Every structure is written in C-alpha cells, then in structure tokens.
Amino acid sequence: MIGDRWGVTESDVLRSYPCDDLVASPTMQAWRGVLVEAPAEAVWPWVTQVRLGPYSYDWIDNLGRRSPRELLDLPEPRAGDRFTTAGGRELGRIVSVDPGKQLTGTIMGAFMSYVLAPCDHDMTRLLLKVVIQAPWWAAPGLAIGDLIMARRQLLNLKQLAERHHCQVAVPD
C-alpha cells in the first residue's frame, strides 16, 4: 500500500510488535523508523513524552501549541494512562509498556507501538508500527496522512534525543 513504509528495513517490517496482537485483521499496517545517534536510555524519555504532545506538526495536531522541547520529570508510563495530549485534550490510552523498550497506545481506533532497538556504537533504531481496522477505501489515505505526521514526529524525537544526549555527554 502506498505510504505504508518509511525509514524501515525488511527486518523491521518482519519483526513482531506489541500492537500486532491488538487488531485481528488490520486494513492498514504502517511501519516507520529512524536511526537515533544516542543510546536507548537517552531516547526512551522522549518517547514517553508523547504523553504531553504529539511532536509532529504542532500547528496542525496541537492547535499551534509547541510540544515540550525539554525533558520534564514524568513518572514512567503505565497501562491505562493517557497516551497523548493534543490541542490541550488528553487523547487515547496506553495499552502496554516495557520501560526502555516499547510503548504501545491506542487513539481513535488505531493501535501503535514505539519500539527501541539498540544498535552498535550507542545508537538506537526508533521504530513505530501503526495498525487499524478501517474501511478498505480509507486505508490508503490514512497511511499517507500517518506517513506525513509520523515522519515529522520521529524526526523531532530523534533530534531532541540526540541534542539532549550530546548536552549530557559533554556538559558545559
């Protein structure tokens, strides 16, 4: 399907994601990925901050409010907690968490898993898989819309994690 993959390898697509078990026959599956030049423990806090904002195009899905650019002292996410905040509204729920490894949530009928896959040299693959059961005719549009927003989100999380890791690794 057009728009269903960005930044992922075949092995990223073939791996198992927690959201795979949550939608029996998804009409849309989308995989996104980015290589972050920081270890997983530096990426994880930024992934958990999606609870505070979407980190994509804030002028679109956050009504112009900027997603936080500094780490806030948040407790570890738990199943049942809110998944994200957009436009000042709490949206969705966290379905499962494996701290430092994966965060899975649901919003508007879609389920999504953020997976951190550590690589060599203190780098991390930040992977996102989205699944949804929607009308067949809507799936291509959803995949393209998600591609645009998820790409921006992952690139923002990458930039923030790398910047913060660099500042912590080399203090002023």
What do these predicted ranges mean?
Residues T27-L35, Q102, F111, M123-R125:
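Intrinsic-disorder/low-complexity, polar/charged segments enriched in Ser/Thr/Lys/Arg/Asp/Glu/Gln
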Residues T85-L91, G109:
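Short coil-to-beta-strand transition motifs
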Residues E10-L14, T106-Q159, V168:
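Beta-strand/loop substructures that line and gate deep hydrophobic ligand-binding cavities in soluble
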Residues R32-V34, G92-I94, F111-C119:
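Hydrophobic/aromatic beta-strand elements that line small-molecule binding cavities or substrate pockets
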Residues E41, L52-G53, G88, V97-Q102:
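Short, charged/polar surface micro-motifs in flexible loops or helix N-caps
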Residues R78-G80, S96-G105:
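Short, hydrophobic/aromatic-rich segments at coil-to-beta transitions
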Residues V43-W46, I94, L126-L128, L157:
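Hydrophobic pocket/interface hotspot
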